[in-house]
Regions:
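Basic/polar N-terminal segments that are highly enriched at the extreme N-terminus
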Residues: 1-10, 442-444
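Catalytic or ion-coupling anion/metal-binding cores of large enzyme and transporter domains
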Residues: 180-207, 238, 242-244, 344-444
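C-terminal catalytic subdomain
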Residues: 309-318, 324-370
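Alpha/beta enzyme core
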Residues: 3, 11-15, 20-309, 313, ...
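Hydrophobic alpha-helical segments with strong N-terminal bias
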Residues: 3-6, 313, 349, 405
Length: 444
């Protein structure tokens, strides 16, 4: 008789491949109006990820699916910065993310001992939580960048996994081959990824290979142990229109596609990160190329920003690109705020960035025919036809702001707003069909 034991099922992929539908798959299916088997099949082959660390699940997190056939998810970045370390301000941003419908929060804290903030965030928020361990490494290990060892970096990754982080951005694809391409071909903006630039600097000074690439199998063991979804960071994303779709970006994307297969082979969930800055007419092709090279893994993009000169309004430049990218295949949008390229965003910036990105995601979902994506739009049309303002607030992505603006400028005529007053087109046509007098206030 064989004494070989069955492998332990830990990750969502493990269970999906064993034919088992987890509570998280059921939750995603219900929220997305999909059959649970639809979710299970796509988790099994990597087209859908459910970032849900086993530690965070025990704390009551909600399950979110990212990937093929699902609604486009939205992420809010926040975290304690060395130049403006104010934890109370960051908690205001957490509250905004939760109250206004973000699906995920990335804690990008890069100053001092960040673990307390991260642990409290995971304890308290039901949203997906992501981090970039490389940001934390210098403060965590209390060493200069060039003194960090492979073991130091992996210790930080393990600490984040133990704390319950659901997905980690790790820049595994920037290896010596990619950096060779980068140095040979050149770029206008070089490398604009913080984590990628740190690893590039470490590699250049030490002469060593990227440890996250060289010891990728060891990294996968940590991720599998806690069911951490690895979000393969795009160190070489374009930081300006000039660099988009260049040899360096493409070389890294090819490497990321290879790493996807290695992760899936051992039951680790994967997302792949993308641009960046990109001209409007290049976005759809880039999304299709990524899906092809990365075998339909969920794609997580930062916009892309469609112009480089929208300073102070980059939540708009990113939302334009985000609507195109998500309607062309991207699955997850990272928000961009008006403070992008300028400063650490404040709470209002976070709200503005989140709402712009949610609008982009929702517009894309309508275009992608995501089940029930247009339901609220149709209800809004009905409410507006009736001039039912209370019903309109219930349909709005941001009812608080809408109601506040409406009430700040009260109309003289009931049911209308101060834009048109008695000349409201909806009111006029309603009165025609009701057979009542069309009073425009000009008869006096």
């Amino acid at each position: 008789m064989s004494t070989q034991t069955e492998p332990k099922l830990v990750t969502q992929i493990d269970f999906a491949r064993a034919g088992q539908i987890t509570p998280q798959m059921k939750e995603v299916a219900e929220r997305e109006h999909r059959d649970p088997e639809y979710i299970r099949e796509r988790v099994a082959d990597g087209r859908i990820a459910i970032p849900a660390n086993i530690v965070h699940i025990k704390k009551g997190m909600r399950a979110f699916g990212v990937g093929e056939g699902l609604s486009t998810k939205v992420n809010v970045n926040l975290g304690i910065s060395g130049d403006k370390a104010d934890a109370a301000e960051e908690w205001k941003k957490v509250k905004i993310a939760e109250d206004y419908g973000s699906d995920a929060i990335m804690d990008l804290s890069n100053s001092g001992k960040t673990r307390q903030f991260r642990q409290q965030l995971i304890d308290e928020t039901p949203l997906m939580v992501g981090t970039v361990p490389m940001y934390d490494a210098i403060g965590y290990m209390e060493k200069p960048l060039v003194k960090l060892t492979k073991d130091d970096l992996f210790e930080v990754v393990r600490a984040h996994a133990e704390d319950g982080v659901d997905f980690m951005t790790i820049h595994c694809g920037i290896n010596k081959s990619v950096t060779k391409t980068f140095k040979e071909t050149g770029r206008l903006m070089n490398i604009v990824s913080r984590g990628g630039s740190l690893l590039f600097g470490w590699m250049e000074v030490t002469g060593n290979e990227n440890p996250f690439y060289e010891y990728f199998d060891e990294l996968l063991k940590i991720c599998h142990e806690y069911d951490v979804t690895i979000s393969l960071g795009d160190s070489c994303r374009p930081g300006c229109l000039y660099d988009s779709n260049d040899a360096t970006e493409t070389a890294e994307m090819i490497e990321l596609g290879k790493l996807c297969k290695r992760a899936w082979a051992v039951g680790v969930q994967v997302m792949v990160e993308g641009p960046g800055h990109m001209a409007l007419d290049e976005i759809a092709a880039n999304m299709k190329l990524q899906k092809r090279l990365c075998h339909n893994a969920p794609f997580y993009v930062l916009g892309p920003l469609v112009t480089d000169i929208g300073v102070g309004y980059d939540h708009i430049t990113a939302a334009i690109g985000g609507a195109i990218s998500a309607s062309s295949g991207a699955d997850f949008l990272c928000y961009v705020t008006p403070a992008e390229h300028l400063c650490l965003p404040n709470a209002q910036d976070v709200l503005d960035g989140l709402m712009a990105t949610k609008i982009a995601a929702h517009a894309a979902d309508i275009a992608k025919k995501v089940p029930h994506a247009r339901d609220m739009d149709d209800k809004m049309g009905q409410a507006r036809r009736k001039l039912d303002w209370d019903a309109m607030w219930k349909c709005a992505l941001d009812p608080v702001t809408g109601k506040k603006r409406y009430e700040e400028s009260p109309a003289a005529t009931e049911g209308t707003c101060t834009m048109c007053g008695k000349m409201c087109a909806v009111r006029t046509v309603n009165k025609v069909f009701e057979g009542t007098t069309i009073d425009l206030g000009m008869e006096d």
